[in-house]
Amino acid sequence: MQNQKIRIRLKAFDYKLIDQSALEIVETAKRTGAVVKGPVPLPTSIERFDVLRSPHVNKSSRDQFEIRTHRRLMDIMDPTDKTVDALMKLDLPAGVDVEIKL
């Protein structure tokens, strides 16, 4: 696998989980001899919801809820076969969504 790169995008609602997962991926890739660029923090998307507190009147009284989606981006340059095998065997937490592009 010469002159290739693996691009890894992580998504999670909890920033501690995503940072821990990114650190595991970086350590695994460096242990197998690959060069890692990142993790680069991408903008956090915030989705807000306004809900009426009362079922009948008082429209001016509302609750506000939000979901924050944290994202990270990493590039693994010149990966070896060992790197790919180690990344496939890596066990990440359930709250982290991983996208891998070769």
Swiss-Prot record:
GO terms for molecular function: structural constituent of ribosome; tRNA binding. Keywords: Ribonucleoprotein, Ribosomal protein. Coiled coil: none annotated. It holds the Pfam family Ribosomal_S10. InterPro entries: Ribosomal_uS10 (IPR001848), Ribosomal_uS10_CS (IPR018268), Ribosomal_uS10_dom (IPR027486), Ribosomal_uS10_dom_sf (IPR036838). The keyword Ribosomal protein applies. GO terms for biological process: translation. PROSITE patterns: RIBOSOMAL_S10 (PS00361). Gene3D superfamilies: Ribosomal protein S10 domain. Involved in the binding of tRNA to the ribosomes. HAMAP family: Ribosomal_uS10 (MF_00508). This is Small ribosomal subunit protein uS10. It comes from Thiobacillus denitrificans (strain ATCC 25259 / T1).
